[in-house]
Amino acid sequence: MSQNAGLLSYRSVFISDVHLGTKDARAEYLFDFLSHIRCEYLFLNGDIFDIWKMKTSRWQWPLLNTRLLQRVMELAAQGTQVVYVPGNHDEFFRDYLGSELGGVQIHREYRHTLADGRKALILHGDEFDGVVRHSRVLKWIGNAGYELLMGLNRISTRIRRLLGKGYWSLSLAIKNQVPNARTYIEKFETAAIRHAREQDVDVVVCGHIHHANLRQDGSVMYANSGDWVEHCTAIIEQENGALELVNWAKESADRLDVRALIQSLPVSAVARGKDRRPVGSGAAHS
């Protein structure tokens, strides 16, 4: 039996918006997902790290985050072409465009040919966000509201775990009821599709807005991989070039035991805030 026996096989996998470094990153689900797949291409489409949060005293780095990055390196070592397109929360890595770090290529955007011949443009998506590009005040207000939503989401997640229930995003359910949020998403998608037409590509793949979607608009397919904070979603390319949206929180609901996964790690260490000691090798952080 080969080491890849029993794994889900895809041609390409697109993930974005993991926000490692924050307490809301669902690293356990992404680690589980990457542990169950093999692929020719893995696209890390921005905001994999949250450098904004890591510059404050409120960042967190559980050992599971390190194991997750090791899994990415394992895939690269096994022959997967890993491409990292930094976003606005990890724009630090935009200083290294054209470089290769640990087998991971770093690009501002990337053009990928699907197996069926379609041309895909991969970019994070903050290029289309008027809030990020034009208004610091609106961005601050939005971030404050988002912090509140994610706080409620953490409480909901803890309660559901105590009740033995699977992951469900309270914050997402609330956002779906806000008309302005839906309008913003529609405008973002329209801007991305327009950009794809201007660039003469068949598919635009982005992230950024934490709203997974896959839809055809005339000659252009819009693909948003969502996030691993609220959705736990990815876009996958099958061997024939077909694109699909995967919700791993639902896919793994009957199987994934988060507590068992975390406890299986050799050290249950967590680095927080101003604690700069190295994580791992025996020292637990509180």
Task: Enumerate the predicted regions with their spans.
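Conserved beta-sheet core of the metallophosphoesterase superfamily
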Residues: 105-109, 126, 130-137, 182, ...
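Active-site-proximal loop/helix segment associated with metal-binding centers of metalloenzymes
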Residues: 123-188
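Residue-level marker for buried hydrophobic side chains located in beta-strands
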Residues: 12-14, 42-44, 121, 205
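Short glycine-/acidic-enriched loop or helix-start segments at secondary-structure transitions
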Residues: 53-55, 93-96, 132-133, 214-216, ...
